[in-house]
């Protein structure tokens, strides 16, 4: 299946997708036990309504996109949101060229289609165009994502032991940090 181009979330225009953002976030936590801000169980008023905590999180991210503190990239498959990633900007005079890669999440239904790679390529393209040349990110040690980032040219910086609480079994897990200098590509 041919994928449409990655698009940038536009506040107002794409607000109708907030529930889909939240449901993908929940799916990734429940399916892969992704260390991504929240723990299950997720509570739904009805099947079409995501957990209020997760929905509010994405509404806050949409507000940050409106304030140009974040750029959110989306991959659609037809009319459905399949995955997303955010580029966070640094609000400091000593590092205006730094950015953070946040919440690269692809719905389990749309995996193995190259969506993560496409999202990251678009994020890097836009980052460069904005003068954001040094990207950093983190992910759980041993997660599938840990293997993706080196293939995309990210350098493993190191790990912090017992960094986060696993949504699977509440044990403490390590977090791995990566960076990529876009000036060198």
Question: What is the predicted role of each segment?
Answer:
Residues 2-4, 10-11, 155, 167-185:
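Terminal substrate-recognition subdomain of acyl/acetyltransferases
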Residues 7-12, 16-103, 107, 120, ...:
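Acetyl-CoA-dependent GNAT
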Residues 104-111, 140:
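A short, internal acetyl-CoA/4′-phosphopantetheine-binding micro-motif in the GNAT/acyltransferase core
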Residues 110, 114-122:
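Conserved acetyl-CoA pyrophosphate-binding loop and the N-cap/start of the following alpha-helix
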Residues 120, 127-140:
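Conserved GNAT acetyl-CoA-binding A-motif
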Residues 136-140, 150, 155-172:
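Conserved catalytic-core motifs of GNAT/GCN5-like acyltransferases
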Residues 145:
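Helix-turn-helix
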């Amino acid at each position: 299946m041919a994928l449409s181009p990655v698009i940038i979330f536009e506040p107002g225009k794409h607000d109708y997708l907030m529930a889909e953002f939240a449901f993908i976030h929940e799916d990734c936590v429940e399916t892969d036990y992704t260390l991504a801000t929240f723990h299950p169980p997720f509570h739904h008023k009805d099947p079409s309504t995501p957990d209020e905590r997760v929905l509010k999180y994405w509404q806050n991210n949409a507000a940050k996109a409106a304030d140009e503190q974040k750029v959110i990239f989306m991959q659609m498959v037809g009319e459905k949101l399949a995955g997303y990633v955010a580029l966070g900007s640094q609000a400091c005079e000593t590092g205006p060229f730094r950015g953070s890669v946040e919440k690269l999440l692809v719905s389990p239904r749309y995996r193995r289609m190259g969506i993560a790679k496409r999202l990251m390529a678009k994020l890097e393209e836009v980052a460069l165009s904005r003068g954001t040349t040094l990207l950093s990110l983190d992910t759980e040690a041993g997660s599938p994502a840990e293997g993706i980032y080196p293939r995309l040219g990210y350098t493993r910086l190191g790990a912090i032991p017992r960094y986060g609480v696993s949504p699977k079994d509440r044990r403490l897990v390590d977090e791995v940090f990566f960076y990529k200098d876009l000036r060198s590509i």
